[in-house]
Amino acid sequence: MFPVIFSANFFELHTLWVFFAIALIVATIALIRLSLANGLKVQFISSNAWKIIFWGLIGARIWSIINNYSSYFSEINFSNFLRLFYFWDKGLELWGAIIAATIYFYLLCKKNEQNFWKWLDVLVPSTIIGLAIGGIGTFFDGTNYGTPSSLPWAVNFDNSAIKFSVPIHPTQIYTFLYSSIIFTALLFIGQNPKVKQMEKSGLVGLIGIASFCFLHFLEEFVRGDDALTIFDIRIPQIAAFIATMGALIVIYRRFRKKRSRLHSK
């Protein structure tokens, strides 16, 4: 569509990176406001932000390398080895970033005696609105595209990197739409007095994870870009299913116990 905003000599300004920067700014603003509203110290995040981002990037890169191993390991040589560290080639994967950043943040909370579940309630909505904006960036960049479609809103991309020359599902816009809806819904849920009173809640964050991952699982059925598969099932789809079920199980176990205590009283 419109992958490069500006190009001159040895410099190119990619639309994707511009929207990623906007997504980071908006997500940060949302995080600060939600943290203050929930009585959490923003300093904990600000003092560890670059560490969280660093491990997120490492995870995103590792997942991308695994997902596109044939591109990096077609030949074993020093040039291909250096390519493993080319973070600027847009070889970053969402699931790797989420998994690595979440694991690191959980360990960080334990080390600093922070309430992981309360932080989850503000981090998940903030991340989801960032992903919504990032979806617009991938649309202009022509990545994360869909399969051929005859639906009225199907889009024909003029991009040599896309393997289809016919109209395809604008899956990036799907991501933007359902992420925006989930973010809005989570804000309303978080304002519910009963949810606010829950000790060590985590309910908002877990609902956000379950709903986003479930809709991403459905999106994977119409994704047309290349991805590593197991038994012809895309690994990102498997990851989305596991994350959905994991979040639902945690919701059931945590909040069933809370209801049982209330009834026993």
Language-model segments: what does each one mean?
Residues 1-265:
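A feature for loop-to-transmembrane-helix boundaries and adjacent hydrophobic helices
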